[in-house]
């Protein structure tokens, strides 16, 4: 048997919009709109550059119903380029493709084999002693286990199953279409299962290989990290290596920054820039769509919260200073005030805390009760506000005491 390579890809979702990045600059919007096509082009170019014998596409080539028939024509042109390079394509249609009116009506080039919908069938590639088994979805909401009906392994060949499935333990928040289990697939006698549907890259087993390549291009903030396809090398009739190759055009990243060590915003932003530079470096020159969470207990909490828009502008400015083009998709503020520190002599601090509690109790109680009475008088008859009022009665004195301690603590820090 000759040695060769093949590519396993899935979930191309051609022309799928990237969510959460609308309303950016016109230049950015046009780049985002083209991201799935450019990732597809990268797939075609990788197969040609690596001299692959064939490409496996494990479903969801399209993103539901075609918004533009040009999407289908673009895909066919990519198949033609592979054919010109002597590369076969074996593909199945997934749940999104089955929602598409044109997916099974496109006039494919001769190098493309689309597995039928009625039943799982086999396709032989005699020159490399490979048998590929697969089945397309007959409808989008396929809930049956179709893997059990895949043909038995063909003796004397490398057997590959192509399946669009929510395999148990890896489905995440994906719909449970064509469910199966890794144990079931492992017992089928195939050498490699080329799976699709789940957008997270995963190798469920290596004996045999049961593999999700993940999707080709991340589409929103939950699809982070490198996206692409699997490049598989076959030597002496056996799977030798399975290597992920990143093909995405825009990289989604979720970052968390701990602000607890900072009480000066300029210093905080300097440290944040260092972190963001590392994020940009890991993207290998790709634009990064960033969801940033700033967390931790910091004295800056009130200022950051009250000046969120200005903070966002500062972070966008930081991103603009980095090499490449990067965007802040969302800023999440999860900071808090640090607990009030006792900066005085312990005996003095204890007496001061007790005095604060006494003064708050005496000063707030009367004012609070009068104010609650006014609120009750303004409520319409029958309003069920007792729980709300009791919560206010409980919370306000506590918050007043916390604020008083915080102010005293700040004075103590200032005195240091």
What are these regions (language model features)?
Residues 37-48, 76, 147-151, 269-273, ...:
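Amphipathic, non-transmembrane alpha-helical secondary structure
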Residues 3, 119-126, 213-278, 291-293:
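Binuclear metal-dependent phosphoesterase catalytic core
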Residues 6-8, 56, 160-162, 194, ...:
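Structural motif
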Residues 247-416:
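Accessory, non-catalytic peripheral segments of nucleic-acid enzymes
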Residues 8, 116, 134, 212, ...:
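Structural signal for conserved beta-strand scaffold positions within catalytic alpha/beta enzyme cores
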Residues 3, 51, 189, 286-288, ...:
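Short loop/turn motifs at secondary-structure junctions
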Residues 1-71, 391-397:
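N-terminal active-site segment of His-dependent metallophosphoesterases
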Residues 19, 25, 54, 65-211, ...:
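His/Asp/Glu-rich metal-coordinating catalytic cores
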